[in-house]
């Protein structure tokens, strides 16, 4: 049976400042930790990325032509405040005014994120969000943006609080590159959630027009053997690390007893303790019913198996299928069923996981109000032939995920839009320019854009709301 989506559904494309803009030191932009980190540790940098800083009119014209009526954009904090605080950079402010004006001219609604992995270097080297002073700096930055950019109708505080902490302190593939420090992961998540809550409360108290929410990456976690209580426990603990801890903070304004039992177990086994203060919970509680929407980024699910051994994580950065490894002491290890498809980067393709995650939010956090799927897409080694990419695998991936969104809506979930990652090809944080996701192919040498087969397919779905 052919499935459909509502008439007012947003068919969007997603970007992020650092992954798309290039121009990393142009017009007064301050440095971010990624600048030197990529130079020192990877085979690529954020120059030129997709040169969105100069070519956004081209990308927004393409968006309009291909039925994309929403775009996720992030503001680079260090374009506004080069050191994260203090003096404002007027050229950075002007750039985003021009960008948002172009969005509205092209009838592409901007959904604007304040922080997408790119804390200014001056604050990052001072502890980033492990340093509580950063909460104040973020709230001040947020307030400036709310006042300055009144043309923005949809605000997101953070993109993917979970993967920020994981990347920085667990997997160690984001600066500062620390591995296996679970206490830092949870503390970073907590402090960012307090920052989020304070910014949301400020937005509502300030009477600013528009809506505000947060974007969480929510990979669904399943037990490898649902009949084995140890596997069930492993999945629950892994879910706490990646999903439940931040969802509780967002919508309960506290951590449930079950969540804290899991956190305490993980820290008992791995060492470290948390600094959770009374005023933090006052802030979380004050914001728990003020979120206008939840953004869910969903790419994959994981299966967890009980495991008794030391932590070891191997990140598959170059698309060498089967080279990744993930096992955490006192938690479990990832072990997927053999019949579940994976990408070359070992990301598990499982659309049902998106349905299950949406329905979990609906059941466990009934004050969620509404959901946007703010990222979903297929990373692929695209082949450019005949001035296009015949990306049938991407079409199949997106189609199956749109179908389960349609199912979730039919089953009572309030899902209002979908943003494909990514609008045009961008560079990937820890995979470089080989892992591509865009609707529009980017020749990174000439910066020419070419619509892929998926762009024509997406246009038809956006125009008809029929998934076929």
From Swiss-Prot:
SUPFAM superfamilies: (Trans)glycosidases. GO terms for molecular function: 6-phospho-beta-galactosidase activity; beta-glucosidase activity. It comes from the Bacteria. InterPro entries: 6P-beta-galactosidase (IPR005928), Glyco_hydro_1 (IPR001360), Glyco_hydro_1_AS (IPR018120), Glyco_hydro_1_N_CS (IPR033132), Glycoside_hydrolase_SF (IPR017853). It holds the Pfam family Glyco_hydro_1. GO terms for biological process: lactose catabolic process via tagatose-6-phosphate. Gene3D superfamilies: Glycosidases (3.20.20.80). The active site is at residues 160, 375. Its EC number is 3.2.1.85. The keyword Hydrolase applies. One of its GO terms (cellular component) is cytosol. Pathway: Carbohydrate metabolism; lactose degradation; D-galactose 6-phosphate and beta-D-glucose from lactose 6-phosphate: step 1/1. Keywords: Glycosidase, Hydrolase. D-galactose 6-phosphate binds at residues 19, 116, 159-160, 297, 428-429, 435, 437. It catalyses: a 6-phospho-beta-D-galactoside + H2O = D-galactose 6-phosphate + an alcohol. NCBIfam families: lacG, PRK13511.1. PANTHER family: GLYCOSYL HYDROLASE, LP05116P. Belongs to the glycosyl hydrolase 1 family. This is 6-phospho-beta-galactosidase. The gene is lacG.
């Amino acid at each position: 049976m052919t499935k459909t989506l509502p008439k007012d559904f947003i068919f969007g494309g997603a970007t992020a400042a650092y992954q798309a803009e290039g121009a990393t030191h142009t017009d007064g932009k301050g440095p971010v930790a990624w600048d030197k980190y990529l130079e020192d540790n990877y085979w690529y940098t954020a120059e030129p990325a997709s040169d969105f800083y100069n070519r956004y009119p081209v990308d927004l014209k393409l968006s309009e032509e291909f039925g994309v009526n929403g775009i996720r954009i992030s503001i680079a904090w260090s374009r506004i405040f080069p050191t994260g605080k203090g003096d404002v950079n007027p050229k950075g402010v002007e750039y985003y005014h021009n960008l948002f004006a172009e969005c509205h001219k092209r009838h592409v609604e901007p959904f604007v994120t304040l922080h997408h992995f790119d804390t200014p270097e001056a604050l990052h080297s001072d502890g980033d969000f492990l340093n509580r002073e950063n909460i104040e700096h973020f709230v001040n930055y947020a307030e400036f943006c709310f006042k300055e950019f009144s043309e923005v109708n949809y605000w997101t505080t953070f993109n993917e609080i979970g993967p920020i902490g994981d990347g920085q302190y667990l997997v160690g593939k984001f600066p500062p590159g620390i591995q296996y420090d679970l206490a830092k992961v949870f503390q970073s998540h907590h402090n960012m959630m307090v920052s989020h809550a304070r910014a949301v409360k400020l937005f509502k108290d300030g009477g600013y027009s528009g809506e505000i929410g947060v974007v969480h990456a929510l990979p669904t976690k399943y037990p490898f053997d649902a009949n084995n209580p140890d596997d069930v426990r492993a999945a629950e603990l892994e879910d706490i690390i990646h999903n439940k801890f931040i969802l509780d903070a967002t919508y309960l304004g506290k951590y449930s007893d079950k969540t804290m039992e899991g956190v305490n177990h993980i820290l008992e086994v791995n060492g470290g303790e948390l600094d959770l203060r009374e005023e933090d919970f006052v802030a979380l509680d004050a914001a728990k019913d003020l979120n206008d929407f939840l953004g869910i980024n969903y790419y994959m699910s994981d299966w967890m198996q009980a495991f008794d051994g030391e932590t070891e994580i191997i990140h598959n950065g170059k698309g060498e299928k089967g080279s990744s490894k993930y096992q955490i002491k006192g938690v479990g290890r990832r072990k997927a069923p053999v019949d579940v498809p994976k990408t070359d980067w070992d990301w598990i393709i499982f659309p049902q996981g998106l349905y299950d995650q949406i329905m979990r939010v609906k059941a466990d956090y009934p004050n969620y109000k509404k959901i946007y799927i703010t990222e979903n897409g297929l990373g692929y080694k695209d082949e450019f032939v005949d001035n296009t990419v015949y990306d049938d695998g991407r079409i199949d991936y997106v189609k199956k995920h749109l179908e389960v969104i349609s199912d979730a809506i039919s089953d009572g979930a309030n899902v209002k839009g979908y943003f494909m990652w990514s609008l045009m090809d961008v560079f990937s944080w820890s995979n470089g320019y080989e892992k591509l996701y865009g609707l529009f192919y980017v020749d990174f040498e000439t910066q020419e854009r070419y619509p892929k087969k998926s762009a024509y397919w997406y246009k038809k779905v956006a125009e008809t709301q029929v998934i076929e």
